[in-house]
Amino acid sequence: MAGKTVTNGAAQGKAARSGADGAVRGKAGMGRVDLIGAGPGDPELLTLRALRLLQQADVVVHDRLVSDEVMACIPAHVRRIPVGKAAGFHPVPQEQINALLVELGLSGLTVARLKGGDPTIFGRGGEEFEAVTRAGIPCDYVPGITAAQGAAVSARFPLTHRGLATGLRHVTGHRARDAALDLDWASLADPQTTLAIYMGAANMAEIARELIRHGMPADLPVLAVSQASTPQEQRLHATLQDIAAALARKPLPAPVLFIVGHVAAMAEDCALPQELYRPEWRLVAHG
C-alpha cells in the first residue's frame, strides 16, 4: 500500500502519541477535522465528498475496519495514522485518539478521520466531534453507507419491504466489560421490524434467546455477514433459534453484522425453507 503508515499495535500507539510531529507540517492558523464514513468496504460506495476530502487531506487517521481498497484512494503523499481497535485489543485508547485529532487540528493540518461504515452509527463519532469542537477546531460529519445497507445491497435484498418489514432498527450487540446487555427486549421483539445487530457475534446466543423469550418467532430468518461489499465477504443463513449454533460451526471473521427479520430470507443465496418466506405476506408485498 502506498503512503506512509504504521501497522503493528505498539507502533500504532507510538504513531498516535507522536501526533503532529511527523513529516507533514501544518498550515498557518487553525486546521480542521472531518469525520468521514468509509462505507462497508467497496470504494465505489464512498460518497463524492468523502473521496474529495481524502484527496485534499494532509493526514488520514483511520480505523482497522477501513478496507485496503478504500485506503488505496488516498494519495501516496498523504500521511496515514492507524488507530484501529479489535475485540479486546485497543492499542490506541479512545481518549488518546481524541487528543490526537485535537493536536493535529491545532497544528493547522487538514485531518481526515476515516471510519468504517458511518461515523454516527456505533462509530464513537460523537465523542470525537465533541472533543474536536470543544477545542475550537472546525469539524464536520461526512456520512457513509453503514454495514447494514452494504450487506443488503451486496446480497440483493431490502431492509424494509411492504408487507414484510415496516421498520428498521440499528442495535449494538456489544456489552461493556462485565456488564449485562442493556437492551429493551420487549420493543425489539417485533417481527415486523428488521433488526440490524452490530458487534453481536460473541453474544448472539443470549440475544436470540431473549428475543425469542419476548415473542420473536424462533424460525425468523437471520443473515450473518462479514466484510460486506468486499471480495472477502462471507455470509451465513440460519433461523433465530439456530444462528448461534450455526456461527459456532462456521465462524465468520469479526466484525459480524446480523440482519434479523423476514427480509433476510430474500437474500440472493438464502437456502432457508420456503415457508420462512411467509408467502401470504409476499403477496401483499408485491401487491
Curated annotation (Swiss-Prot):
Molecular function as annotated in GO: uroporphyrin-III C-methyltransferase activity
What spans are recorded as compositionally biased (Polar residues)?
1-10
Q: Which Pfam families match?
A: TP_methylase
Q: Which positions in this protein are listed as binding S-adenosyl-L-methionine?
A: P40, G116, G117, D118, T146, M199
Q: In which pathway does it act?
A: Porphyrin-containing compound metabolism; siroheme biosynthesis; precorrin-2 from uroporphyrinogen III: step 1/1
Give the catalysed reaction(s), semicolon-separated.
uroporphyrinogen III + 2 S-adenosyl-L-methionine = precorrin-2 + 2 S-adenosyl-L-homocysteine + H(+)
Q: Which UniProt keywords apply?
A: Methyltransferase, Porphyrin biosynthesis, S-adenosyl-L-methionine, Transferase
List its EC numbers.
2.1.1.107
Which Gene3D superfamilies does this chain map to? Cobalt-precorrin-4 Transmethylase, Domain 1 (3.40.1010.10), Methyltransferase, Cobalt-precorrin-4 Transmethylase, Domain 2 (3.30.950.10)
Q: Under what name is this protein listed?
A: Uroporphyrinogen-III C-methyltransferase
List the source organism: Paracoccus denitrificans (strain Pd 1222)
Q: What is the lineage of its organism?
A: Bacteria, Pseudomonadati, Pseudomonadota, Alphaproteobacteria, Rhodobacterales
